[in-house]
């Protein structure tokens, strides 16, 4: 399995160092790694082999090897393959939900307010944000992948791409409008980094 590093990661590190937010960036990257391991574990359980893991500024991305030697069999079982891909896509956000639930339980029933110097509230909030962001119906985010696979099962691959692309574009336009408003209203340039 190959490990690839996008050079923009170092730019993000520099920005978060300069703004003294490196602790938050480190937390988000750790949570993103755990999130991505959810995809890897689900993929392995469902019979896929991880080909590469890319480290990108906003986290990690795993690519699975698509074995095409039994292509006709895959076409016959296309719906099962699409369902497996949807399960793999949901596995990452599901990991964030589990971490968030455990954090909430720790926060409610114990006196623990920090884990390794990180406040439980920040852990809950970070996992919630990662979950919400990844479940947006924007391809190639997890929500977009799930949408594509579910539409694929019902209407076929071509229609799945068309519908997913249209929904992705609409959601991106809406998010860009909200982000533009937020930048103007709150004068927070960090929102630009999120959009990029």
What are the functions of these language-model segments?
Residues 1-4, 90, 156-166:
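Short, amphipathic, aromatic/basic-enriched membrane-interface segments that mark the entry/exit
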Residues 1-2, 74-136:
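Metalloprotease/metallohydrolase-associated module, dominated by Zn2+-dependent proteases
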Residues 3-5, 17-76, 122-126, 130, ...:
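Small-residue-rich helix-interface/hinge motifs
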Residues 7-10, 92-101, 167-176:
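Core segments of transmembrane alpha-helices
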Residues 12-20, 175-184:
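Hydrophobic alpha-helical transmembrane segments
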Residues 107-120, 149-164:
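Membrane interface segments of multi-pass transport proteins and intramembrane proteases
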Residues 118-125, 162-173, 189:
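Alpha-helical transmembrane segments of integral membrane proteins
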Residues 179-196:
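Transmembrane helix-loop-helix
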